[in-house]
Amino acid sequence: MCQPQASQRAADEQRSSHLHNAMTRSPPIQPILEEGIDRKVLATLRARFLALSAARLERAMQGLSTRQQQAVQLLPLLFHVNHPLLPGYVSASTPAGLSGFEPDTELLAEAQRLTRSFTYKPLRGRPAQPIWGLYLMGSLGTVAQEEHSDLDVWVCHDSALDARQLDELRRKCDLLTAWAASLGSEAHFFLVDPQRFVQGQRETQLTSDDCGTTQHYLLLDEFYRTAIWLGGRTPVWWLVPAYEEHRYHSYVDTLLERRFVRAEDVLDLGHLQQIPPGEFVGAGLWQLYKAIEAPYKSLFKLLLVEVYASQHPQVHCLALAFKQAVYAGQLKIEELDPYICAYRAIEQYLRDRDAPERLELARRCLYLKVNRPLSRPPRNRNKSWQRVLLEQLVRDWQWDERLLVRLDDRSRWKVRQVIQERQALANELALGYRFLSDFTRLQQAASSVSRRDLSVLGRRLFATIERKVGKVEVLNIGISPNMAEDSLTLVHGEDAAGDLCWSLFTGSLNAHEWANFAPLKRTRELIPLLAWCHRNGVIDAGTRVSLFAGDSGLSELELFNLLSELRQALPLPLPPVDAQTLLATAQPRTVLLLVNVGLDPLDQRSLLQMPEDGAHSDPLGYAAARENLVLSIDQVQLSSWNELIVSRYEGPHALPDCLRDHLQNLPADAVDGLPQLQVRCFSRNRGQAIARRVEELLLEARLQLASVHSRYLLQVRQQFHLLERRPDSVRATSLNDRTALLAHLGEAHHVYRPLRLDRHALKGDDLRLILPLARPDCLQLFYRVRGETAELSILDECNALWCQRLPCRDEQQLLMPLLRFLRSVEYRRNARVSLHGDDGEAAFDIQLYRLHGDPGEPSASVERRPLPQGGTSDACYEVQAIVEPGETRSQVTLYCNHREFSELEYGARLCIAVAEHILSQRRDGERYPCYITDLDLSGMHGSGRSQTVQLLRYKARLEAALNAALAQL
């Protein structure tokens, strides 16, 4: 127990020193509460813990600079007094007074060296001492202490402090943090209210490696086995044997009630009897999350979490083992080192599971964490105690010098070493995730938060280590600080199977040398290899690349430009991905399109045919031959999950296929948050024009296909490519010629689908004038008269196209039959439409247009014409058709001026009979064409609704059959 006087403190330290020297011969202590406990036994136990703490503090000081040592030494005094001349001063009323503490002359002398005018005045009487304890947490004093290890300080305070006092105490801690930084120490002070802590309530993180309030018991375990006592009360947990942990509270109550210990001498932070399974999930998630960026430190801790979780519910944590060793008199400080104890537990766990590869990785993690390069001589003549301890471990592991050299050279590891290590790390990350997932499911330990975190972590792991088609593998998951090579050789040639590929070699090799070396990487295409080099930092701005392009057509200038574009479009390091982003589906963030890599679509012959007037300057239909200058596209896409994916498109469909996939990756109805798009082409001839055309096309297609059911028409040479946004995909249809295009545009689809044209599509074609005029719920009739023939086109209510060529002697005779038919369609439609308009259908509107001028000339135009007055409603010879489903085929019934002609009566002679009747009704037997004036297909469709284009097609077939029969008579 801390004594109020410096002389008593010195006596404590002297006793601790004697005990430290006699650690190996300390007898075991097994107090039994019911048999009574000698206070001397409790004093001995306390002295053992204090001796270990003092020994760790001494070792911690050895690893600190003189100024850093000063910061640690003065902390008890700085929390004991408020003095304007000392660091951390806020006000005279700031809570101060470290329980049971009085500074000795050496400490006061240290304070006066800091501030000469400072004089210490002992407090008289029994003043309040609201600072109950100061403890250093973490790796200080352990084998893993580094030169820049953080100082995590727990400031345990009186639970009675009010909000104002706590605020002043926090301000004091902030000032001390700044002061420690001026001495070269990164200090973090954490206020701990013991009463709230025991109840699992805390307001802030309690270590610089703390992930929140869900790890109460694991944090307490770490505190009890790593904390270094600086002053104040000592944990009452020290005085409760491990075999009494199950009745911790009653045991402590007895110690206090029987006055074996005084309440003002001890600090109660709780016990470690049982750790809830949810804590292992939370801790495992946190360590796994950090292991993706810094694997060695975090995987070691993750393995310890796995050890604990595997013991659930009877978890014998390391703090209890540490306490057992102290009671047993096993006080050798090296064996009680927190990291060594953790390693021993991990080693036993992995040996029991026959996992030698995982054990070797755990050893490498510990070795690299300790960071004492054993293949190199020590900095000083005398070896540090960490080095001596590590040398003993390495001898036990039977590591050879070559392995030590490789590990000590990690800062200079390049591709080959990183690839070798990445496999082991990726396997361990995957194993850790599966263990956590299985443990969560078996123990039903997942809260809604941990389920969400598991999902996020799974996606983060998937984005980092999982392989998939086109994805650039990330090698350097916190393994090496710099993988850039000084020089590389890039070769295009044949592989062992005789197939062409790109190979990357280290060093600057000539044609006679590279055959004798194994490449770092091979790929079929160039861009995946360059993207891999960039993403993994293998090539940076200072790397010299020797190029042997073979027959690829790649020049050194183009290679330089490609690498520069990758660096510009995808600057490294990539920004971290937050959890909210991982909860959503991965979306493209940056898209770089590289057109015609290593290709020049214009040879000298093509250059002679360059258009002079710009009429055929479109790269998708260039010159008189309408050449397509887009021969290949390499797409490099960075997703919102930081996945880099490379896709290649080549051949005549390269552009539409790339466009389809690009649009497929965009969310439907997306306006904001579209990925940044960059298009580059380094072809010698018209490279910039090609890139500009492709970029404009993609941006236009993005805009026009932003909503569901929208369509976009692109023409490449004489081929057409129609892209359509479906609810869950983008569909691309390639059409070889205009005939195929007309057939496709004439298909029924029962929902309005707007169609937008690329600015170069259908140039010189009437469709260029017609298609942009489409409107929903309209029947739009377009006609062009060419001498004695006319071309009719109809856009129906859903924007389906129907075309027909007819003889034309008179516009009225041309239009009236078709307009009568459309009126009957309109009538049937309007008869179905609810007066309230709540059935999803709208009434039709019929519009008439005439086309003028040559479609290839600027003078071409479309004129809106009024519907002919009268005519359509005048008396005429009615030919109505009703089509119904039959057992094997549809059944047609025709009505000629209300006289019925059915297949039941006439069979195969139906059309002949109707033709004869029609002919008999005409004056002088005139043989002009007959027309269907009304058609009902409602029985053929389950919905009862026929799209107009379907009616027009069936009408044309019936009319053809009737007119053929008429011609035979």
Tell what function each PLM region has:
Residues 89-148:
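Well-ordered mid-protein domain cores that form the structural environment of catalytic cofactors
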